[in-house]
Amino acid sequence: RELDPLLRQSIRRFSSEFINRKLSLSYTPPSDENGTLQMITDDKWFCFVIEQLLSNALKYTQAGTISIFFSQPNVLCIKDTGIGIAPQDLPRIFEKGYTGCNGRTDKKASGLGLYLCKRICKNLGIGISITSEIGDGTCVYLSLDQYPLKAE
């Protein structure tokens, strides 16, 4: 399955929020030596992960840009210029119910979004990791080639 249409579908779900909040979106479509990047995945769950990550980026970004790009051939990045995640919270962000100091100030935070993303990514064979700096934003990395499929 081509990744570009899946990513565009997920981005479109938030287009009005980007416009209403005057946030910039930078999207660089994926490509490989054949022109388009493809992967075997479950469309519904892959889009769920992308949409959850975009929702988080929008929730914690007051101004600036959310960027979606490939930092390496098979590593998708969703980067924001938001408030960032405190260093002491980073090791626990994928724990069920953990909201960290940002989540405690946001009444809508459940501590389930990143937990579900991690579980779904594991089932899809996708690695997920996060880097963040307070006041500088967050970058989520999805390693799409972490578990190569073997022909049987």
What is each of the regions a protein language model found here?
Residues 34-41:
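Conserved micro-motifs of the catalytic ATP-binding
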Residues 57-58:
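Short helix-loop "hinge" at the ATP-lid/N-box region of the Bergerat-fold HATPase_c
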Residues 63-75:
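Short beta-strand/loop element within the Bergerat-fold HATPase_c
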Residues 80:
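Acidic ATP/Mg2+-coordinating residue in the GHKL
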Residues 85-98:
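Short conserved segment of the HATPase_c
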Residues 98-108:
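Glycine-rich ATP-lid/hinge loop adjacent to the conserved G-boxes
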